[in-house]
Amino acid sequence: MKRHEKIPNLSLLILAGGKSSRMKKDKSQLPWQDSTTLTHMLTNSYVYPFERTVISANRIIEPQEIPDFIRQSSIQDGHTTEYIRNRGLDTERHLAIVSDRYSDCGPLGGMEAAMRLYPSDRWLILAVDLPFFDFSRVPALLAADASEYDAVIPVVEGRENPLAALYKGRVYEKIRTALAADDYRVRKIYNKKAIFIDETPYARQYLNMNTPIAYKEALACATNQNRPVPVVSITAETSGTGKTHLITQVIKELSGQGYRVGYVKSTHHMSTGPKRNSDTDLATRAGAVCTALIPDGPKKSRAIEDAAFSMSVDLVLIESRRHGLFPKLLVLPPEAGAAEEDNETVALVTRRKDTNSVHFNTLHVDNISALAKYIKLLANL
């Protein structure tokens, strides 16, 4: 993204002080691309010349989380520490870390603390769990702004995103009023005074991670973004689950939508030659443009990876019981017990209706269109 001229009185607030009740762990400290979600967002923000950056956090922020910033001072109210950074940048960057004065008030608590100490004409306010927000949409938010409105709210597929939005500094008084009334709804401060812009074409920018499932799905998207070709594995713990039939149906669906699909099959057989009605033959007849059959061997996982990444396709589907690559969809037979949590499986594919889990998404084995849509999400298609 190109660098922009500095816009006076446009500040950035990163909300990193929430309870993360659905995630069950601090979202600002989740591992992300060799750092954390907080560090990732802060580093990404350097592309845009904000007047000041404020992090709302109700914990101690370690120096490694804000690389190259030098501590300048602590404001005597005990809620704020200020930093400055100038190494490797065209202009100095001013950073403040503030804690809430009003506890247990959600995002409004962080917004109040930042706006009270650092008045600014406009604020870009972002939740910390937006790993794909790269600040390229900031000009669009600014262009949509109008003086009589208090906020510019992105809308994705009909859903408002008030924690990835532009606000006027004057909403501070509305925040104080809402807090005094114990009304912690963010919508309260922009209701009837906002411009809504359709950002559906840029939906990935606004993808957030509120749950363990959403976090794994975001990691899958990021992993595939950095591969030569995106990969999704379909696995099963036992034979006879129908995963080959499922894969051929998905290949047929995706091929019908115009995607070039590759297929890699992990097998324990040593013979890998072409054979009528073999799994690779069925995949080819379903529409796969490339197939590979990988037998057992000491470096089988590497062989599967090499075969997948050598294919000139839009997506590779891997069928394997144990050697698939992340992300994985696990096919469960109706009689199977509860699936154990693991870091590589993002969804269960089953006919069962009692598989509600905080660790996995659940897809019905007969809903091929939904399966294909979900696979496209993981593959960034």
Cite the ranges covered by each PLM segment.
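Nucleotide and nucleotide-moiety/phosphate-recognizing core
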Residues: 3-161, 166-170, 176-183, 192-205, ...
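Short, charged/polar "capping" segments at the starts of alpha-helices
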Residues: 60-69, 271-274, 336-340, 353-358
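A charged, well-structured terminal subsegment
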Residues: 177-213, 368-381
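Extreme N-terminal, non-catalytic leader segments
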Residues: 203, 214-233
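Glycine-rich phosphate-binding P-loop
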Residues: 232-255
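N-terminal phosphate/diphosphate-binding loop that engages ATP/GTP or pyrophosphate donors
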Residues: 249-299
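Glycine-rich phosphate-binding loop used to anchor ATP phosphates in small-molecule kinases
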Residues: 296-334
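Phosphate/Mg2+-binding loops and adjacent switch elements
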Residues: 318-381
